Amino acid sequence: MKKRSLGLVLGCALLLLAGACGTGQDETAGAIGEGSSQGSESESEGSSQEKIFGEFETVTLTGEPVTQEIFGEAKLTMVNIWATYCGPCIQEMPELAELAREYEDRGVQIVGLLSDVSEPEYATAMEIVEETGADYMHILPSAELQMNLLSRISAVPTTVFLDQEGNMTGSAYAGARSKEDWSGILEEILGEVGA
């Protein structure tokens, strides 16, 4: 009986680890990233052309000021919302860094948005970024981002794509993906935005 119970507990734990990590927020909070299983795509109603970020002022992990104007710096911005406690988030970061370099010439930028909202995690986040080689921009969650976006995220990683005006293009993607999967998604969205 003990072995069976232990097996059930371990099996459940593995299932949880295999997918996206919960945010610790109300799991019914919103439409963005609602499908919390690995690799799921969330078709949120009205997601196309929605300004999910709104106006914001924040800083990067290294302290530089950032506003919503960063989206105008590229034809397409891939925003990967991640957390320091999320294994799948951290595992995909090296490949996201490779994609950032490979797609830079095509007008694509990748931005990481840390969903951890307390300062002690910022040092941990910096260590993770350095260890994984994820040298693309990572921004911290301002009050505006917490209210307008992070409150609607039910799992990390969640990835969204934004055009130059900051409008969401396509769907929100919950869960980590391989470099090849992200490359295919990028190609599809670049075709849609005419880049």
Kindly give the residue locations of the regions a language model identified.
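Bacterial signal peptide processing site
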Residues: 22-25
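Structural microenvironment flanking redox-active thiols in thiol-disulfide oxidoreductases
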Residues: 90-131, 143-148
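Thiol-/selenol-based redox modules, centered on thioredoxin-like
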Residues: 163-195
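Short, internal strand/loop/helix patches
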Residues: 126-162, 173
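C-terminal motif of bacterial Sec signal peptides marking the signal peptidase cleavage site
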Residues: 16-20
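A short beta-strand-turn-helix
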Residues: 55-77
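Bacterial N-terminal signal peptides that target proteins for export
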Residues: 1-8
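Aromatic-flanked redox-active Cys/Sec active sites in thiol-based oxidoreductases
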Residues: 80-85, 115
